[in-house]
């Protein structure tokens, strides 16, 4: 064994010496006086990058080639090799060889004192050499071969491996890897230095800003909120001293003091409760002549809600002033006035059966004259008792059977005067149960002076039914308590349309995009709540995740200063989510479920499954151009767009448009349409005024709105409206009916489009 290893080492030494003393290659050589310009480092790296695919082929290109080793001066060697074919070696192994089944290596030498040797690995001459030796080794036990024979076979195997060449190749590869590591280390050092500089700049900027954190800005913005709310006399919802129980007691005390100026008959004094906090709101009263007595039976107050609580569905118990005095505040000048309607600037026309005053049971007065309505003041139909009736109060109300005359109230100077005789309100209109219905929304800003609002305290009365007025809607009185979940009646849907606006008719043009910000990854979505009074912006970065980020306004969004974040209990998929009426609607990742997440209470408010959705079980982890389940909002409310199988046709996948109940996420067959749009054949889609629009491409700069489906007429057209994807990678398009804008996420850029209607 030692002898064999010694032979291998000697042969390697001879081969190395032979290569070292080999004659230089013939041909032209470069003159020594010509200076070559060394390539720069950038050129070397560029050449390495260009030739990176040929590195291994260059290193291993002559691995199986025959090499000539020469020794001596002026020596020329030539090797002529005739290898054995694969079929020939198989015939040799099978014992059916032919005369031509052999290989030769011929050496041709020229020149004095020249020694040449042709070196060829067995793999280049006999392709079956390795298989032959392996077969012999396997048969060694049965043939009882000697150890020397096995050593010879191993030597041949090592020789066939060409270890010297492998060592050379390995050395070159190691050298290249070392060079790569050195370059990477330099680049990492530069990047680390740049990162340190950036971190220092960020720290310096943060130190300069100081207390400009979003959490501290909440306290700084309270004076702005107060100044904005001073335009509305009843909107004092941001201060704890204006809680409803204190407001009622203090206001009642003020009004009772003002009534002392009037000559009234002795009344049972009400239960006096000392105000726990000083009253900051002044109730403006106008003095009345002492010779005209006034009867006060009940007082109704309105309390606006916090913008964060405007969509909260909580039923507060009514805290009326006790009605045992038999008084009713009918003086127009002493009512709390509002500066704007509750819903929108456009006021709905009043119905013929409505009037400014509530219709009472007695249709005629004591003098036989029909009852007329007051233009500005409202007469409550009854003194609504608390939800838990007090026995003493009930007894006093039942004993009170004599109708009390009331004084007529002069109308507002801005309105037409209507002669109003004294009216009688029978005591039978008193109800012992009352329900409180929350106002539709908080007043956004100033409004006409003649408009005022009452909290809708409805009281069930025998026929004729009592109607209570709330700005922008008519609602009949109902008995019992309101269910905890909100129900969208047609009147309330009209209120929503009044808040976010009504349809402007046919879509005519979509203007070019306006880039608002650059934020986040290539895929994502940003949106605003069309029913909110503030300008908050919500962002979902990427098409998969579970964190919703909130910004107070667009300016904070541009600065990257988020004000809140919501960790969702279930992840979303896609970019088709929306924020509507204080809730986040999205499709749970890798499921058929849609979820409504209440942003104020931070819990899942509703959950539903789309049974007919054409869901791909093996959804690939890549963006496919649009979301499978897409929510949309327009002037009519909440919509849902998703693919489903067309049962009536040839079981093709079609896009379904369905009106979604925002409360329980339910859909109705009457408001569900199967469109002619096909899956994966469009870019993004959105809904405007009950019409579904689809863009033909999401990654072409100049695209078109190539499809429109009208839910009013059940017709579909090809509008061919131009739509520009400025950054050629739009992953979200959503319509906001409040702003009349399209919000889009285009390759990490947040852009908006103005919507222009034909009329």
Swiss-Prot record:
Main location: secreted
Signal peptide: 1-20
Disulphide linkage map: 503-689
UniProt PTM: O-glycosylated and N-glycosylated.
Domain called Olfactomedin-like: residue spans: 502-759
Cellular component GO terms held in the UniProt record: extracellular space
Region of interest (Disordered), residue spans: 346-396, 456-494
Secreted is among the record's keywords: yes
Subunit structure: Homodimer. Binds to heparin and chondroitin sulfate E.
Name assigned to this protein: Olfactomedin-like protein 2B
Organism: Bos taurus
């Amino acid at each position: 064994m030692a002898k064999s290893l010694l032979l291998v080492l000697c042969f390697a030494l001879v081969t190395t010496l032979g290569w070292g003393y080999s004659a230089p290659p013939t041909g032209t050589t470069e003159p020594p006086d010509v200076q070559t310009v060394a390539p720069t480092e950038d050129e070397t790296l560029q050449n390495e990058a260009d030739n990176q695919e040929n590195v291994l082929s260059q290193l291993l290109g002559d691995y199986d080639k025959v090499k000539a080793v020469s020794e001596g001066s002026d020596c020329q060697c030539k090797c002529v090799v005739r290898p054995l074919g694969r079929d020939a070696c198989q015939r040799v192994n099978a014992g059916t060889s032919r005369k031509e089944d052999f290989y030769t290596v011929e050496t041709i030498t020229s020149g004095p004192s020249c020694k040449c040797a042709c070196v060829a690995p067995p793999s280049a001459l006999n392709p079956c050499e390795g298989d032959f030796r392996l077969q012999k080794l396997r048969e060694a036990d049965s043939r009882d071969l000697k150890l020397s024979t096995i050593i010879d076979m191993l030597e041949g195997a090592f020789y066939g491996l060409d270890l010297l060449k492998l060592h050379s190749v390995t050395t070159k590869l190691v050298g290249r890897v070392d060079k790569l590591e050195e370059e990477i280390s330099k680049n990492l050092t530069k990047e680390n230095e740049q990162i340190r500089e950036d971190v220092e700049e960020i720290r310096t900027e943060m130190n300069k800003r100081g207390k400009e954190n979003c959490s501290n800005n909440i306290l700084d913005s309270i004076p702005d909120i107060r100044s904005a709310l001073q335009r509305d006399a009843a909107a004092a919802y941001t201060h704890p001293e204006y809680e409803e129980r204190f407001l009622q007691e203090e206001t009642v005390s003020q009004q009772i003091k003002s009534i002392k100026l009037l000559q009234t008959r002795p009344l049972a004094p009400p239960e006096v409760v000392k105000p726990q906090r000083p009253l900051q709101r002044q109730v403006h009263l106008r003095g009345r002549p002492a010779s005209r007595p006034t009867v006060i039976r009940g007082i109704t107050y309105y309390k606006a809600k916090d913008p964060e609580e405007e969509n909260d569905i909580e039923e507060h118990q009514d805290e009326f002033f006790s009605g045992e005095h038999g008084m009713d505040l009918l003086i127009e000048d002493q009512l709390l006035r509002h500066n704007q309607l509750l819903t929108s600037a456009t006021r709905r026309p009043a119905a013929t059966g409505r009037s400014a005053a509530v219709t009472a049971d007695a249709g005629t007065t004591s003098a036989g004259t029909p009852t007329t309505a007051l233009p500005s003041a409202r007469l409550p139909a009854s003194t609504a008792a608390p939800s838990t009736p007090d026995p003493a109060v009930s007894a006093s109300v039942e004993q009170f059977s004599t109708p009390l005359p009331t004084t007529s109230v002069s109308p507002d100077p801005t309105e037409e005067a209507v002669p109003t005789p004294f009216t009688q309100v029978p005591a039978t209109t008193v109800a012992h149960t009352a329900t409180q219905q929350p106002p539709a929304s908080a007043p956004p800003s100033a409004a006409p002076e003649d408009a005022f609002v009452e909290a809708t305290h409805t009281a069930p009365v025998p026929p004729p039914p009592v109607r209570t007025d709330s700005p922008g809607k008519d609602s009949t009185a109902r008995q019992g308590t309101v269910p905890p979940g909100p129900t969208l009646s047609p009147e309330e849907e009209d209120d929503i349309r009044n808040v976010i606006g009504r349809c402007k008719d046919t879509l005519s043009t979509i203007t070019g995009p306006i880039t608002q910000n650059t934020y986040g990854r290539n895929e994502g979505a940003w949106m605003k709540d069309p029913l909110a009074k503030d300008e908050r912006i919500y962002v979902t970065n990427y098409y998969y995740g579970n964190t919703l980020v909130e910004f107070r306004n667009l300016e904070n969004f541009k600065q990257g200063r988020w004000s809140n974040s919501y960790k969702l209990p279930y992840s979303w998929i896609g970019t088709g989510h929306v924020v509507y009426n204080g809730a986040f609607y999205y499709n749970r990742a890798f499921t058929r479920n849609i979820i409504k997440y209440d942003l104020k209470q931070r819990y899942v408010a509703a959950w539903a499954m789309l049974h007919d959705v054409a869901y791909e079980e093996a959804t690939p982890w890549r963006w496919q151009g649009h979301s499978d389940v897409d929510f949309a909002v327009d002037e009519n409310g909440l919509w849902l767009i998703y693919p489903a199988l067309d049962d009536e046709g040839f079981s093709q996948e079609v896009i379904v448009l369905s009106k979604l109940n925002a409360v329980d996420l339910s859909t109705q067959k009457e408001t569900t349409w199967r469109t002619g749009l096909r899956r994966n054949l469009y870019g993004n889609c959105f809904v405007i005024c009950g019409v579904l629009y689809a863009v033909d491409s999401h990654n072409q700069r100049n695209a078109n709105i190539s499809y429109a489906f009208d839910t009013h007429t059940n017709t579909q057209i090809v509008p061919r409206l131009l739509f520009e994807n400025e950054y050629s990678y739009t992953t979200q398009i959503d319509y906001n009916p409040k702003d009349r804008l399209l919000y889009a996420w285009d390759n990490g850029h947040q852009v908006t489009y103005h919507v222009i209607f034909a009329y």
